[in-house]
Amino acid sequence: MAATGGAKTIITAFIANFCIAIAKLFGFFITSSSAMLAESIHSFADTSNQALLLLGRKRSKKLPSSERPFGFGRERFFWAFVVSLVLFSLGSMYALYEGVHKVRHPHDIDSLWWALGILLFAMILEAYAFKTAVGESRYYKGKHSWGSFIKRSRIPELPVVLLEDFGALMGLVFAFVCVLLAKITGNAVWDGVGTLSIGVLLGVIAIVLAIETKSLLIGEGALPEQSAAITDAITGSPEVLHLIDLRSEYLGPETLLVAAKIEFR
């Protein structure tokens, strides 16, 4: 699986999330909606996360040294794991805290049309970023399901941005529906419910990302089809009598370490 993808997706998401974060923050000051504030914090967290992913890509390109003879490819795994922690702590935990506060102390939403207009604007930008992530990921996904792609991918940035953008889009839908319900019913508790929903959604996504990126950080081997191709290449040599053992581990998205115990003729 090639590992050069992801840069376009990250940059697109970074620009979109930064613009969305500013728009949502402006919307919060106008409407006093806690769901809008939670979404603003969410978008600022996503923006910082894309910056961390770009940092990881840059640091991974450092040349090997005597202390790091296999290079710095794992930097991309590490920073992807940090992203999951930021999403959980800054995004999910804050949204849950703000949601509980809003449910206990509801506050009417001001300027409904401003709130809905800003959320629709954010949905358009986020949908474009998500479409870009899906388009680039589809190339690497192949015939596998999206769930399988997230588990199999050795390129950490694509699943991270894909799930972040999906979470952001769904969070906007939650915020839009709950802000509308709060105004229709006259019950501002719905605004808090929307904020809590966003917090739960971000928490689930952060946990999934943490599990997958932790697995890459600890070390994952070649995919089954890659192991089969390596085995065929070794056993196809006339000098090889028997392949006793084969082990592999990704040292970075672009570096696969292979160790083989071979009996020669």
Which residues does each predicted region cover?
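Short, charged cytosolic
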Residues: 46-61, 136-146
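Alpha-helical transmembrane segments and adjacent TM-loop junctions that form the membrane-embedded core
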Residues: 6, 73-265
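Acidic (Asp/Glu-rich) catalytic motifs at the cytosolic membrane interface
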Residues: 16, 29-58, 96, 100, ...
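Residue-level hotspots within pore-lining transmembrane alpha-helices
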Residues: 15, 38, 121-125
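Topogenic membrane-insertion module of multi-pass membrane proteins
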Residues: 1-23
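Aspartate-rich (DDxxD/NDxxD/DxxxD) Mg2+/diphosphate-binding motifs
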Residues: 53-75, 105
